[in-house]
Amino acid sequence: MSDEEVEQVEEQYEEEEEAQEEAAEVHEEVHEPEEVQEDTAEEDAEEEKPRPKLTAPKIPEGEKVDFDDIQKKRQNKDLMELQALIDSHFEARKKEEEELVALKERIEKRRAERAEQQRIRAEKERERQNRLAEEKARREEEDAKRRAEDDLKKKKALSSMGANYSSYLAKADQKRGKKQTAREMKKKILAERRKPLNIDHLGEDKLRDKAKELWETLHQLEIDKFEFGEKLKRQKYDITTLRSRIDQAQKHSKKAGTPAKGKVGGRWK
């Protein structure tokens, strides 16, 4: 039998079952007793309705209905649907796994790119540091070379001075000795002024007073430093002005033909 014939037979059986159920319901309704509350209880005769005639399903001639075949086809259909659900589930699972693998690959790729960028950045920074170190070494070498050339020029100039060279060295040593003596005196004065700060035995109020006193002293020292700086600037300005006046006077005296006193060989004449 074909699938269409099997479905037709199934529909006929279903219609037959529905007709039987409707007939049973009608039969029950007909046989229900009608209760009437009156002075005299009389039971009416039950009226029976004619039952519908049931007709057997039409079976095609020459063919028999194989219910096992129908059941088998239903099972096969259910199995096919179940298999389709299983296949779709595994396909979705496979797709999720592929997406997860792709995501991990993207993460690893991004991590590798970031590491490469950091390596390139570190290499550029290292090259920059090396370049700065080379420039610094080159500048130091040039400065040392320039100082050596200046020293050589000074030595040549001093050697050309002849007899005045020894006196110049003596005066230079004398000035160096004076500077050393002045530095020692300064250290001695500072050592006398810089007294040890013993504040372990002081309380909170005395510490506050001591801090205030130190702050006032520091403030006064800053004022004195500023005043001395301004005084030094004025003195330098006065010296520069006097030197320019002396130079102008010497120029005028040379033009007039009168000898002028000048500094020759490090000595005033």
Curated annotation (Swiss-Prot):
GO terms for biological process: positive regulation of calcium-dependent ATPase activity; regulation of ATP-dependent activity; regulation of striated muscle contraction; skeletal muscle contraction. The keyword Transport does not apply. Residues 1-23, 35-47 have a biased composition (Acidic residues). The modification N-acetylserine is found at S2. The keyword Phosphoprotein applies. One of its GO terms (cellular component) is troponin complex. In fetal and adult fast skeletal muscles, with a higher level expression in fetal than in adult muscle. Residues 24-34, 60-72, 111-153 have a biased composition (Basic and acidic residues). Transmembrane segments: none annotated. Keywords: Acetylation, Disease variant, Muscle protein, Phosphoprotein. Pfam families: Troponin (PF00992). The modification Phosphoserine is found at S2, S88, S159, S166, S167. GO terms for molecular function: calcium-dependent protein binding; tropomyosin binding; troponin C binding; troponin I binding. It comes from the Eukaryota. Residues 1-72, 111-158, 245-269 are annotated as: Disordered. Belongs to the troponin T family. Troponin T is the tropomyosin-binding subunit of troponin, the thin filament regulatory complex which confers calcium-sensitivity to striated muscle actomyosin ATPase activity. It is linked to Arthrogryposis, distal, 2B2: A form of distal arthrogryposis, a disease characterized by congenital joint contractures that mainly involve two or more distal parts of the limbs, in the absence of a primary neurological or muscle disease. Distal arthrogryposis type 2 is characterized by contractures of the hands and feet, and a distinctive face characterized by prominent nasolabial folds, small mouth and downslanting palpebral fissures. DA2B2 inheritance is autosomal dominant. This is Troponin T, fast skeletal muscle. It comes from Homo sapiens. The lineage of its organism: Eukaryota, Metazoa, Chordata, Craniata, Vertebrata. The gene is TNNT3.
